[in-house]
Amino acid sequence: MALALCACGSAQTADTPAADASASGAAAGGAVASGVEDGVLTVAMECAYAPYNWTQTDDSNGAVPISNVPGSYANGYDVMIAKKICEANGWELERVQSDWDSLVPGVQTGTFDAVIAGQSMTAERAEQVDFAGPYFYATIVCVTKANSPYASATGIADLAGGSCTAQIATIWYDQCLPQIEGAKIQTAAETAPAMLMALETDSVDFICTDMPTAQGAVEAYPDMTILDFSGTDGDFQFSDEVRAENVNIGVSVMKGNTVLKDAIDSVLSTMTADDFNALMAQAISVQPLSE
């Protein structure tokens, strides 16, 4: 169980005194508590990032209560993965809602035991937290309207000059969109739903995201279509290392918490890419259309 069952404020950053104290304690050789001594795994997510995670008003399709948002329930691929981890280890699952920018600080300070929220296993994040997994492999794609002139694009060169956005603090916004020649990059979206709404309302011509988010989008918005350039010369260009970091989706835990990391890995290591894809397809099939 985490030290506190509330989301960190968005103003808190990785270099806050609390985070520094936690990091220095681990560096000094002090034992890091697993967080699950009481049999409860407290897991944070946005609860607004379908099909990875979303909020709904009841427990249908296996949704679980959100402990810090009474009357609300979380569901999605991340919830399904968290339930498998808890079932295998004999833990009770406690879900906490947090905004995206507070997820890493929340793990660092012990506010949550783990984050299962569609996080890419980037080198920058790995300096702040430890990762178990991966628990999904997510291709980077673009999404546009089916009737858009960009719908026939076969590579990023065909997106030149278009207006676009992506979610804040992601490789999609920071590294992908700038590769498109003449792109009119708009303000980053705070959440995945806000990113999708920018496209749906024609505020932008296209967005950049990962394949599961895109697949969930076209389920909710049939007028959208996916542009998948992966494996072609027209794809976004990264080093193999950077691409692997941002395709691999992992579970973050406090630095030095090897007990919890190993317990999570013991479950994820038994699952194949086909298992992950089947579970993701299940999540997409039950996501609310409003997401």
Residue ranges and their predicted role:
Residues 43, 47-50, 71-87, 119, ...:
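Bilobed "Venus flytrap"/periplasmic-binding protein-like clamshell domains
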Residues 9, 80-88, 148, 162-163, ...:
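Extended ligand-binding regions for polar small-molecule ligands
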Residues 87, 92-158, 237-243:
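Acidic, polar ligand-binding/catalytic clefts
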Residues 3-7:
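C-terminal motif of bacterial Sec signal peptides marking the signal peptidase cleavage site
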Residues 91-92, 108-117, 162-164, 200-213, ...:
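Alpha-to-beta junction loops
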Residues 20, 29-118:
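Extracytoplasmic small-molecule ligand-binding "clamshell" domains
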Residues 102, 117-128, 175-178, 205-245:
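A ligand-binding cleft/hinge motif common to bilobed small-molecule-binding domains
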Residues 8-24:
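Bacterial lipoprotein signal-peptidase II cleavage site
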